A protein has these predicted regions:
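Charge-dense, low-complexity intrinsically disordered segments
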Residues: 17, 21, 65-68, 123
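Hydrophobic, well-ordered secondary-structure segments
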Residues: 5, 20-21, 25-27, 55, ...
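Intrinsically disordered, low-complexity regions enriched in Ser/Pro/Gly/Gln/His and often acidic
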Residues: 36-37, 71, 119, 135
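Short, low-complexity N-terminal intrinsically disordered segments enriched in polar/charged residues
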Residues: 2-52
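A solvent-exposed, acidic/Ser-Thr-rich amphipathic alpha-helical stretch
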Residues: 43, 47-112
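A beta-strand edge to alpha-helix "cap/lid" segment located at domain peripheries
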Residues: 2-15, 83-163
Length: 163
């Protein structure tokens, strides 16, 4: 290998490492932004994390099957539900583990979501903990979530979904 070839190889490797670091940071920010923007009720920014069609899987908590819906529809459902059900919420998401594969990625994270009810007849709060499994695709507008799976591992308080 010539010196010039070695320099080109090193530059390419450095670029790849830098791009991978940028991708990892953008993916983590995209995932974190979903919970934070929902908590801030900034639904446009929450929506910006998603592709146009997204598979949502809440079967560990709600039963049934995963559903694929437009992100706009899901955001509107969350907006309506949060407005009528919760005074405030706080989603803490961390311990991100990423797998990058070209223009697709997965991000598995722990979460803890604290919810303060408007109607306190079932209690003041509900806290849920578990994992998120996000699948993302690189787009011209950055990384977008194409699948979001929530696996509930524990909860305290009364779920708003309990009868």
């Amino acid at each position: 290998m010539t010196t010039a070839q070695a320099q080109i190889r090193n530059q390419t490797m450095n670029h790849d490492v830098a791009q991978q670091a940028l991708d990892r940071q953008e993916i983590i920010e995209t995932v974190n932004k979903i919970g934070l923007m929902a908590d801030l009720r900034n639904w446009a920014e929450c929506r910006a994390s998603f592709s146009d069609q997204v598979e949502f899987d809440y079967t560990s908590m709600l039963g049934g099957q995963p559903t694929t819906v437009s992100a706009d529809t899901q955001i509107q459902q969350w907006k309506d539900f949060f407005a009528t059900t919760f005074k405030t919420t706080q989603h803490l998401i961390g311990s991100h583990t990423l797998t990058l594969n070209g223009n697709t990625a997965t991000c598995i994270s722990h979460f803890q979501a604290h919810h303060v009810f408007r109607d306190t007849s079932k209690g003041k709060t509900w806290t849920l903990g578990g994992t998120y499994d996000h699948e993302l695709s690189r787009t011209t507008k950055g990384w977008k979530v194409t699948k979001m799976k929530m696996t509930a591992l524990w909860e305290e308080g009364t779920s708003p979904f309990s009868k």
